[in-house]
């Protein structure tokens, strides 16, 4: 089996938490060419969402990261996978 490693690319990401949702969804998510539907219920006690892509619909759960890929694609990523794959970039 041939092994590969991920190329070092810089992405935009935002963690979907109650606190972050109350502060506001980033413009790059709002303006994406994909349908991103994020919502809250019961006064903000429950949050969730869905991202519609060409490959299908993805559920967004609390604490998931929403990522903008290298080609502008928007998709969710579970926190454990995100933290194993990405590290914060100092600007």
Predicted regions and their residues:
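Short, compact, well-ordered microdomains
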Residues: 55-91
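N-terminal domain-onset segments
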Residues: 1-54
């Amino acid at each position: 089996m041939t092994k590969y490693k991920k190329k070092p690319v810089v992405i935009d990401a935002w963690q979907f938490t109650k606190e972050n949702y109350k502060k506001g969804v980033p413009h790059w998510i709002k303006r994406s060419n994909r349908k991103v539907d994020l919502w809250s219920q019961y006064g903000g006690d429950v949050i969730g969402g869905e991202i519609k892509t060409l490959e299908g619909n993805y559920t967004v759960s609390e604490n998931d990261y929403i990522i903008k890929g290298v080609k502008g694609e928007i998709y969710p990523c579970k926190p454990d996978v995100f933290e194993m794959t990405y590290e914060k970039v100092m600007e």
